[in-house]
């Protein structure tokens, strides 16, 4: 069973027991269950259900595994012939979730 859902303005593809990295969910602790109701698409053994825009009775249950930081993204600027160099780094906060079940 596969599903496409929307969370925090982004769309994700999920299947049972998948681990997915999403932007940080503030206020949720490790081990807590979350319920996702904005499901766009479900595919189950040849049966395809498409929402307009969302599936009304669909729920995805996921468990928060941990909060982590992504690898460093480097932004480097320079100007030719001036000797100007600027190096900045950024690490995005992420939440790792595990899909427990998909119901429709």
Curated annotation (Swiss-Prot):
Give the highest taxon in the source lineage. Bacteria
List S-S links within the chain.
none
Pfam families assigned: Ribosomal_L21p
In Gene Ontology terms, what is one molecular function of this protein?
Answer: structural constituent of ribosome
Q: Which GO terms describe its cellular component?
A: cytoplasm; ribonucleoprotein complex; ribosome
Q: Which UniProt keywords apply?
A: Ribonucleoprotein, Ribosomal protein, RNA-binding, rRNA-binding
Task: Give me any GO biological process, just one.
Answer: translation
Record-linked InterPro entries: bL21-like, bL21-like_sf, Ribosomal_bL21
Describe its partners and assembly state: Part of the 50S ribosomal subunit. Contacts protein L20.
Q: What PANTHER family does UniProt report for this protein, alphabetically? A: 50S RIBOSOMAL PROTEIN L21, LARGE RIBOSOMAL SUBUNIT PROTEIN BL21M
Q: Which family does it belong to?
A: Belongs to the bacterial ribosomal protein bL21 family.
Q: What does this protein do?
A: This protein binds to 23S rRNA in the presence of protein L20.
- What is the protein name for this chain? Large ribosomal subunit protein bL21
The species this protein was found in: Karelsulcia muelleri (strain GWSS) (Sulcia muelleri)
Per UniProt, what is the name of the gene that codes for the protein in this document?
Answer: rplU
